[in-house]
């Protein structure tokens, strides 16, 4: 597939406009704005990385759907690259991309994401302090602080939000569907760690499927796994897929894909490409699909 270029249309995400320049910190990506999110409801500081469509300044009348991605410091640049290909193929609309991140030159991303993206306390070896189980608090931060700030600062369309993530980020993405259905309209979970804490998410999904919220939800959900994952991880994803299909929540349009020949992290590229195409299918005219 040839890469998208500015000459191919509004294909590339550009650096975000600066409506609040005094609050903007250093740029860690060439074409992204890093905006601090301090003093939030859980007492922890965050940053967001904002990438805007190239047409953003030229069309002030337009509003854009938003993709929020976990691990923005890793997966933001990846989705930004995939974005150009999606636009070239006309399989997604222009969208704003917001990556979740953490401040500091030496932030321990592994530790921080484990704290924020997991919905339950997992067993801790040697009796150490738990470092998991704060997904509910982080989801509150997203709902009460990050989304409102994004929708004030940018011309974001509040009617179509997508949440995406991989591994623990994929676990969090699915947790968000069951915990706050309706906050997002589509979910992309690449190789999600659904076996975490003795299949905790399976119980969340089962409770959700029995709830009144499940009868009212309208969402598109994409899940992937890799056939070269660790057997326990791939087995958990397969079992989760079977449970989702068995419950068949009417308002959820669900797609599952096994990425052939890949390991855990290697699912990201194909998963985000296919997942975003699936997420945005309702916004793409039939002749462009």
Briefly describe each language-model feature range.
Residues 5-289:
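Non-catalytic cap/lid and distal C-terminal segments of serine-dependent acyl enzymes
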């Amino acid at each position: 597939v040839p890469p998208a270029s500015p000459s191919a249309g509004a294909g590339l995400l550009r650096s975000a406009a600066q409506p609040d320049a005094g609050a903007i910190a250093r740029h860690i990506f060439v074409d992204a704005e890093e905006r601090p999110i301090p003093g939030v409801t859980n007492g922890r500081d965050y940053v967001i990385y904002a990438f805007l469509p190239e047409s953003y300044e030229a069309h002030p009348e337009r509003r854009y759907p938003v993709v929020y991605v976990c691990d923005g410091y890793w997966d933001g640049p990846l989705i930004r690259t995939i974005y150009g290909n999606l636009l070239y193929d006309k399989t997604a609309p222009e969208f704003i991309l917001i990556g979740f991140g953490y401040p500091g030159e030496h932030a321990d991303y592994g530790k921080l994401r484990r704290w924020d993206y997991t919905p339950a306390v997992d067993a801790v070896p040697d009796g150490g302090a738990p470092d998991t189980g704060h997904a509910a608090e982080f989801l509150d931060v997203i709902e009460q602080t990050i989304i409102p700030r994004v929708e004030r600062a940018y011309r974001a369309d509040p009617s179509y939000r997508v949440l995406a993530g991989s591994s623990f980020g994929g676990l969090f993405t699915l947790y968000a569907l069951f915990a706050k259905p309706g906050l997002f309209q589509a979910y992309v979970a690449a190789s999600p760690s659904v076996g975490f804490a003795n299949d905790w998410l399976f119980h969340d999904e089962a409770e959700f499927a029995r709830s009144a919220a499940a009868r009212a939800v309208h969402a598109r959900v994409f899940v992937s796994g890799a056939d070269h994952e660790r057997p326990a991880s791939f087995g958990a994803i397969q079992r989760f897929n079977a449970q989702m299909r068995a419950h068949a929540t009417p308002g959820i349009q669900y797609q599952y894909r096994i990425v052939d020949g890949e390991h855990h992290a290697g699912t990201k590229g194909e998963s985000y490409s296919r997942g975003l195409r699936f997420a945005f299918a309702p916004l793409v005219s039939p002749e462009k699909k």
